[in-house]
């Protein structure tokens, strides 16, 4: 068994270790480089998935527009842009009603009609 003097020495050493190790209740372990890299990759993956979902929704809107039978003007040449400003008009019969349109559609429609 330990004597009282040895027990006091052990207690003083334990107190010194606890007092000098300034953890302040915070976790002592820091993140390793691999954990930081994993979190970075996860953030990039999530933002990439958000972009893919946005693109999928936009392509679905285009597909629905074409499926409605909207007239598509075919032009000679490789340019997809209208040759004249007058050629760039909205198709009146296939516009969304204001109840169905989202804010971006309303902004585009008001700007296009004011010109």
Curated annotation (Swiss-Prot):
Stretches of the chain forming a coiled coil according to its record: none
GO molecular function, one term: peptide hormone receptor binding
GO CC annotations, alphabetized: extracellular space
UniProt record, GO biological process: cell-cell signaling; intracellular calcium ion homeostasis; positive regulation of D-glucose import; positive regulation of glycogen biosynthetic process
InterPro entries: PTH (IPR003625), PTH/PTH-rel (IPR001415)
Residue positions assigned to the propeptide: 26-31
Residues of the signal peptide: 1-25
Family membership: Belongs to the parathyroid hormone family.
Subunit structure: Interacts with PTH1R (via N-terminal extracellular domain).
Function: Parathyroid hormone elevates calcium level by dissolving the salts in bone and preventing their renal excretion. Acts by binding to its receptor, PTH1R, activating G protein-coupled receptor signaling. Stimulates [1-14C]-2-deoxy-D-glucose (2DG) transport and glycogen synthesis in osteoblastic cells.
Protein name per the record: Parathyroid hormone
């Amino acid at each position: 068994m330990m004597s009282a003097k040895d027990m006091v020495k052990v207690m003083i050493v334990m107190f010194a270790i606890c007092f000098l190790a300034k953890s302040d209740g915070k976790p002592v372990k820091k993140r390793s480089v691999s954990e930081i890299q994993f979190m970075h990759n996860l953030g990039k993956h999530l933002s990439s998935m958000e972009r893919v979902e946005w693109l999928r929704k936009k392509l679905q809107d285009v597909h629905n527009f074409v499926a409605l039978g909207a007239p598509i003007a075919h032009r000679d040449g490789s340019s997809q842009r209208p040759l004249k400003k007058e050629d760039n008009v909205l198709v009146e019969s296939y516009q969304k009603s204001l109840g169905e349109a989202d804010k971006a559609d309303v902004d585009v429609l008001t700007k296009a009609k004011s010109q």
